[in-house]
Every structure is written in structure tokens, then in C-alpha cells.
Amino acid sequence: MNELKNDRYLRALLRQPVDMTPVWMMRQAGRYLPEYKATRAIAGDFMSLCKNAELACEVTMQPLRRYPLDAAILFSDILTIPDAMGLGLYFETGEGPRFQSPITCRADVEKLPIPDPEQELGYVMNAVRTIRRELAGSVPLIGFSGSPWTLATYMVEGGSSKAFTKLKKMMYAEPQTLHLLLDKLADSVILYLNAQIKAGAQSVMIFDTWGGVLTGRDYHEFSLNYMHKIVDGLIRENEGRRVPVTLFTKGGGPWLEAMAATGCDALGLDWTTDIADARRRVGDKVALQGNMDPSVLYAPPARIEQEVSTILASFGQGEGHVFNLGHGIHQDVPPAHAGAFVNAVHALSRPYHQK
């Protein structure tokens, strides 16, 4: 495999010295880019785009051609695992993801298979290998998965939800059924992420988009517990270097200490957590990724630069910061504003890394 020309992102995740703060954006390959829309039109629909290694590679590379980003992230979807378990993923226009066969009872959970990632999810591994070849060592490639709790929200609700009543009913009325589901999902995620690492992912991230809807007790029992199991099961060395693991719970600000104790290398922060406070609490254990409100990108470039400057100053001197948004970039952000953001991070961060 190619020697990395820019390993700033991997170094920052391990709290090693860098010349400037690395930056990438969640959903950096996406609908705010006209070239993405054009490629998706060629594919026909979202899952066809994910399942075609060449097209998935193309959309992964598109933001890197526009912006000096410090990492590429695999173009895929968190719902590939439940789809491979046989739930029948499809996308309703304007409605988001849906499942033809959602989980309704214990029998549904018991019959769920644990997918073989090179078989049922081989298209993801093909995309990873294709992207690594295309990157040719320019920047690292991030692999990812949804967390068991977040995957379960879609599998039990049958799609997106605001109140999660079906899943919370299962959690409170049939906790053992939910634990069985989460355990199967954790085993599936371990196999899936390890296959991504073997295929060439140089860092992995676990997205716990919906962990923040839980009480503290329930978060520990039904979400963090299973992410901890995954971290324990991951390959942590490959191609002669460490493979860093980042956990991201949206709304996870109250639980950073417990998240840092899982053995992960970094925590993603949403914009509701103060990064200075987060660094005081866990900065001696993990790196921090984040955490600009994605809506700042609607503002003029001068305002974007001001926000970047504020967050850099809030984190302060030294290592262990990967700049990112606090969640995915919105689809109607002007591409030039994303460019202003990336350039501002690089331009304004150098003084924070001088010895």
C-alpha cells in the first residue's frame, strides 16, 4: 500500500505533533456538490451509488478535488448492515430510509443473520479498495459504521423517527429482546469494520446519531456498552501503524468521560458541547473532533472564519484536535463556503502548533 503523503489527520487522532489542525467534514461527499448530484443521477438512486465501487470512489474523491481536506471518508450508508441482514432497505423520496421488514418481536431478532462482510457487504470492501488505489497515499481513508443503538432505531422503527416510541417500548418492556438485537449488531459491526480495515481503511468512526435521546443510565446500558464491545473487538494495527477509532454520539456531551474510558482514540463532539470544557474533561485521554455548527456555513466567509477562530482558540495550544462540523454538512450550503471553512482551519491553526 502507498506511503501516506499527508498523515496529519492520523497523527492528530493519536495526539501527536502536527503543523496545523487537520480538517474534514462529515458528509463531505454529498448533495451540496453539483458534481455529486450529477454522479448520483448516473447511478439512478442512492443505494446503486453505494453499490458501484467506481461511482462510490468518484463521489468520495470529489470533495478532495475541490478542497485541501486532510482525510477522505468512504462513501456509504450506516444502514448497509441491516440491509445485509435481510430487512429490505429502500428510500422514499422526501421520506428518507425505510425497511420493508422491520423488527417487531423477539422471533424477528432471533432469526437475524450476522452478515459476512466480504460476501453480503462485499460491495463496501470493493469501494474501500478502489478508493485506496485512487487516493494513492494522498490522505488517509476513514471507514465507518453506525452504532448498534442507532442501527436498532431504524430497524425497529422501520425508518427515521422523532420519538422512537417502538424502540423505547422494546427497551422498557422487553429489554432482553433489545439486548439480543444490540449484541448481534455489535458482532456484525466488529466484523464489518475489521473487514474495512483489512480492505484499506486507515481509521474508523462509529456514528451514534441517536444515543442522545437516552437517559444517562439507558445510554450506558443500551448504547455505550455495545460501542465498548466493538472497540475491544477492532483491529488496532494495520500496515505498520495504529488504526485510530473515533466514537461520536450526537448529544453525547454529558457522557464524555465514560466514552473516553472505552479505549477509543478520539471523540466526536457536536456543536452543543464546549470544546474547551471537553478538553479539560477528557483531553488527557483522547483526541477531540469537531465541532462547528454546520449552519455556520450559510454565513458569509468572514463569519465562518470568525467561528473557526473561536473554536481553535477554545481548544487552545497543542495537539489532539481534528477540526470538523458538529454533524453533517447541509445539502444547500454553497460549496465556496465549505472551501472558506477548510482554508480558514489551515490558515488560522498554525500558531496553535508552534513549539
UniProtKB/Swiss-Prot annotation:
Localisation per UniProt entry: Cytoplasm
CDD domains per UniProt: URO-D
Coiled coil, from the record: none
GO molecular function: uroporphyrinogen decarboxylase activity
Enzyme Commission code: 4.1.1.37
Gene3D superfamilies hit by this protein: 3.20.20.210
Major enzyme class: lyase
GO cellular component: cytosol
UniProt catalytic activity: uroporphyrinogen III + 4 H(+) = coproporphyrinogen III + 4 CO2
Residues noted as binding substrate in the record, renumbered to the chain: 27-31, 46, 77, 154, 209, 327
Site (Transition state stabilizer): 77
Keywords assigned: Cytoplasm, Decarboxylase, Lyase, Porphyrin biosynthesis
Pfam family, one: URO-D
Signal peptide: none
GO biological process annotation, one example: protoporphyrinogen IX biosynthetic process from glutamate
Pathway: Porphyrin-containing compound metabolism; protoporphyrin-IX biosynthesis; coproporphyrinogen-III from 5-aminolevulinate: step 4/4
Annotated disulfide bonds: none
Family according to the record: Belongs to the uroporphyrinogen decarboxylase family.
Function description: Catalyzes the decarboxylation of four acetate groups of uroporphyrinogen-III to yield coproporphyrinogen-III.
Oligomeric and partner information: Homodimer.
Name of this chain's protein: Uroporphyrinogen decarboxylase
